[in-house]
């Protein structure tokens, strides 16, 4: 069964167009504008933990990357007091290959998404506490000895993509014509 899941993950990597793996477009960056920061929450499933990719390490690495990129980080309390409830959710999932041909391989996905409170324009009485307004996903396959490095690299690239979008959405443009 795991052999088929690994094969499916490889096929998914090959067949998914690059623009489907991320939703970072000019038209949706405005949803990051004025958030005032994000609370970072990480999730890693048991197979990821078993190959050395722990939720705690991912949380620390993610926060370091975001701070270095000058993205404001919120505590959980600050996030709950913010009307947007801005959360950057990082989810890592792994499938460990078993049997002929898949033994020693690990298929993985790294998902980074911004969730925030949203209100329906057609009826302001309807609000959603967790609407995904920005996301990016990376998928890959690595040998069990290299999965931690591969996952960390994909996470870094994905977080840098978010940081760029966030900073650009929250940087005021100079309207003075450079004077």
Q: Predicted segment positions?
A:
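Positively charged n-region of N-terminal signal peptides that target proteins for export
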Residues: 1-5
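N-terminal, post-signal-peptide region of Sec/Tat-exported proteins
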Residues: 51-82
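Surface-exposed short loop/turn segments
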Residues: 69, 79-133, 141, 145
């Amino acid at each position: 069964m795991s052999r088929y899941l690994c094969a499916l993950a490889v096929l998914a990597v090959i067949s998914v167009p690059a623009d489907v793996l991320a939703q970072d477009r000019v038209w949706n960056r405005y949803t990051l504008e004025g958030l005032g920061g994000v609370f970072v929450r990480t999730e890693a499933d048991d197979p990821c933990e078993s190959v050395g990719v722990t939720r705690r390490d991912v949380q620390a690495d993610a926060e370091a990357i975001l701070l270095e990129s000058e993205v404001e980080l919120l505590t959980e309390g600050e996030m709950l007091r913010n009307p947007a409830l801005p959360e950057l959710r990082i989810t890592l999932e792994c499938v460990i290959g078993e049997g002929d041909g898949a033994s020693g391989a690990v298929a993985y996905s790294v998902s980074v998404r911004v969730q925030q409170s949203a209100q329906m324009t057609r009826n302001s009485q309807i609000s959603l506490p967790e609407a995904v307004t920005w996301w990016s996903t990376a998928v890959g396959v690595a040998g069990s000895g290299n999965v931690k490095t591969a996952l960390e690299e994909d996470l870094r690239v994905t977080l840098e993509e978010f940081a760029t979008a966030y900073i650009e959405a929250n940087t005021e443009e100079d309207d003075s014509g450079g004077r």
